[in-house]
Amino acid sequence: MRKLILFILLLQTVFTKAQFTNLNWTFGDSCGIKFNANGIDSIYRTSVNARGSCATISDSLGNLLFYAASPDLELYQTPSLIDRGRIYNKQHDKMDNGDTIFCQNWYREMLILPWPDSVNKFVVVSSMTTPGAKISYSKVDLDYNNGLGKVVNKNVVLDTGEISDGITAIKHGNGRDWWIIYKKWFYTNNTIYKILLTPNGLSSITTQSIGVPSFVGSFYRLIPSKSGEFIIGINPGDGTLEKFSFDRCTGNFSNHSILNNASPNPAYGLWDGATSLNERFLYITTLSTPEYLFQIDLLNPNAFQNKIVIDSIDSLNNPGSGIRLAPNGKMYRSNSWCQNGLYCYPFLDSVFVPVNTHLSVINEPDNFSLACNYIGLGQYLNGFRTYLGLPNDVNLALGPLSGSMCDTLSVGLSEVKDDIPIQVFPNPSTGNFTVNIKHEAMHMYGFTYSIYSIQGLLIQRGELKGKTSSINLTFFESGMYLLNVTLPKQVVQIKLSKL
C-alpha cells in the first residue's frame, strides 16, 4: 500500500520535477568547467575571482543555471565587509539583488540547493566564521528576468555564532527534502547542527552530540559519501579524522569511529577530502610542508596508519590543495600557489605557472594505491587559474532511499513556513476547509485540486477559483488526507486533518 501511495504522488508531481546536476564547476580566477560522462566537455570564462567558497547548479542537460562565490578581489581588499558573497546568473552577470550575500573568504561556506517541489526556486546557504558570524540563506527565483533570476529573499539568518568552515547538505531519504549540516566553532565540543529544508521552508535547528569532544576551530570539514550513508569529519586544527554513519530519514548520526586521533601537534595538517564513487577510498590533502595527497582504505581496520602516499610536494609555494569528486567519476585537485610562500591571493597578473593553471587528476579513484592513476597537473585550464577552493557542491542526483521508512515523502521535524502560495484554514477542521490563494496575480485563474485518503485513494477532485474556495469533507471519516493543488509550475501538497 505504501508503494501505491508513492506511485500516486509521483503521478501528481512528475511533470514539475526537474533533475538538477553538478555538470558545471565555477571556481578560482574566472574558471568554468563543463563535464560530460567521460571527461571534460569545455572550459570557459566565468565571473568568479575567489580563492575559496563557490557553488554551482545546472539543469539535467548540463546547462548552467547560476552560481555563487565568496568575495572577489574588490571586496576581499575591504576587510571591514562581512556580506561579501555574490550570486551570478547563467550569463555571468551579477544576478538581480545578488550582491552582499553573507559570506567571507574561506572554502566550504556556500551551498546551492533546489527548493523542494519547485522547478525554478533555489536556496543559497552561506556561512561566516569570525565573530559576529552566522549561517543564513538567500532564495533565488529563476522565474524573474526571463530566466536570469532574482534573489527574492536575502541573508535570512538561520543560526548565529561562529560557523566552522565546512557546511554540507544531504538529500533526505524521501528524495525531495534536504538536511543542512554544520558544526560551530567552540573550543571543545562534539555537537552537530542540522536544519531540514522542505517545500514549506526551513525547520528549527536540531543538535546531536556524538563522538569524542575535540577542539573545533574555524575549520571542520563535513564530507558526505556519494550515497549519503556516511560522513567523514576532518578537523584541520588538531588532526582528528572521524567517520559517522548517517540516517537520511531521521538525520541522525551513529556508529562513530576515529580514523586518526586528535593531537596538540598533529603530524599532518589534514585539510580537505573526498570519497571515491565506490565509497571504499578516502582521499585526503594536507596543509603542511611537504604537502601530501593520501589514499585511505576505509575497509582497513587501521585505515589511517596504513595510508598510501599518492603524491607529495615539498615547496613553500604549495601550502595546500582542495579535492573533489567530479561528475565524470574522476577526482580533481586544486594546487594552490603562493608567490614566495606569502602572497596566495590575489595572484599578480604576471603569475601564470603550471601549478595554478592546471588541476591534478585522479583518473580511477576506485582503484587501490597507485592504480588510481594519478596525474599531477594533468588538466590544463586553458589559461584560467585555480586557487585552493573548489565547488562545495552536493549530490543533486541522490534519489529516495528505496524501501526505507521515509520513502513516501513523510518527514518529522516542525517546519517554518516560507512563501507558500496556498494557505488552508482551519486545519484541523470538522470538515469545512477554506483554501486561500495568497498571490493576487493568481486569482484570475482556476487550479485543479485532488484529495487522497491515507490509503492513496482519490476521494475528491475539483477546481479552486478566485482568492478563496471551500472544500467540504464533512461526510468523510476523521483522519489525515492529502490535498494536491496543481499550480502552473509546481504541485503544492498540504496535509488536511479532519476531526
Residues of each region from the PLM?
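Bacterial Sec-dependent N-terminal signal peptides
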Residues: 1-23, 230, 271, 411-413, ...
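Positively charged, low-complexity intrinsically disordered regions
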Residues: 3, 13, 85-87, 109, ...
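N-terminal compositionally biased, intrinsically disordered segments and leader/signal-like regions
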Residues: 14-17, 207-208, 431, 435
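Beta-propeller fold recognition
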Residues: 19-259, 263-412
